[in-house]
Amino acid sequence: MARIAGVNLPSNKHVNIALTAIYGIGNSTARKICTDLDIPPFIKLKELTDGKLEELRNSIAKLLVEGDLRREVSMNIKRLIDLGSYRGLRHRRGLPVRGQRTKTNARTRKGPRKAIRAR
């Protein structure tokens, strides 16, 4: 298991798939990193040399990933809430932020249904 950006990556998977285990790196970013470092994307992580692993670590260290990215996203949401903007209000109330309908649907964001009181 290679440890990159504080994450233990599965060594039996292909490099581009293993990199997606890092928060902030998706398929397209993983492919771009592999092409920039001349790493064949379908080589297993355990087959990489120590030099290539070090290059991979240095390349990922330049990106905003894991804790730093999570912190920045939460700070952005907190900023919206503090501004009192409409988006901040929706975040605070736990409702959909991007204009989706809420009369029906939006159950994931709103949580389980509240029981209607019998009269």
From Swiss-Prot:
Keyword Nucleotide-binding: no
Residue ranges of the region described as Disordered: 92-119
A GO BP annotation: translation
SUPFAM superfamilies assigned to the protein according to its UniProt record, in alphabetical order: S13-like H2TH domain
One cellular-component annotation, GO: cytosol
Molecular function in Gene Ontology: rRNA binding; structural constituent of ribosome; tRNA binding
HAMAP family for this protein: Ribosomal_uS13 (MF_01315)
Subunit structure: Part of the 30S ribosomal subunit. Forms a loose heterodimer with protein S19. Forms two bridges to the 50S subunit in the 70S ribosome.
Similarity comment: family membership: Belongs to the universal ribosomal protein uS13 family.
PANTHER family: 30S RIBOSOMAL PROTEIN S13/40S RIBOSOMAL PROTEIN S18, SMALL RIBOSOMAL SUBUNIT PROTEIN US13M
Protein name: Small ribosomal subunit protein uS13
Annotated source species: Nitrosomonas eutropha (strain DSM 101675 / C91 / Nm57)
Gene (name only): rpsM
